[in-house]
Amino acid sequence: MHHLKARAFALLIAGSLIMPEAVLMAHAQVSQSDVQPSFSAIMNAGTRADRVKSITKVPSVGVVRLDVPVVPLMGSDVPSWQEFKIMVQRNYAGVSKLRRALMANPVTRAALAKYRIDPSQIAGAQISSRGSLRLYIFSRWNTRP
């Protein structure tokens, strides 16, 4: 029995060495605490696009999926994914500018490729002073404007 536990642990460690990106990136669904930052990221996408060209390294990428269904909690005001989609449509010029800027910078383009994020999925972003990205995305099947 001890050998089985040791093997499972060894496989877990070996898997993280073979595919480190699977361990480093986490997807999260939008929660109550993400609502305001999500709307802010979408509404300010155009101004945040201007900061992308100065990014020289991306130490981490966090992803918040806007279209993962959530179970509403009592007193929760988490919008539906359709409301986020409407916000993207209203701010489409800024969102498009952000997507183009992320693809124009080779460092951010490589980070998106590493985590298999298609630019058409991106609705908004937060950019830290160190270059870390927190991306607010839609699933591939919800990327149409």
Regions found by a protein language model. Give the residues of each.
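Surface-exposed patches in mature extracellular/periplasmic domains of secreted proteins
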Residues: 51-59, 63, 110-114, 120-127
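Solvent-exposed, non-transmembrane amphipathic alpha-helical segments
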Residues: 21, 72-75, 118, 131-132
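Short N-terminal helix-initiation segments at or just after the protein's N-terminus
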Residues: 30-39, 79-85, 140-141
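Mature extracytoplasmic domains of secretory-pathway proteins
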Residues: 62-114
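Amphipathic, charged alpha-helical segments and their helix-to-coil junctions
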Residues: 115-145
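Short amphipathic alpha-helical surface micro-motifs
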Residues: 42-47, 104-107, 115-120
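N-terminal leader/targeting segments
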Residues: 2-71
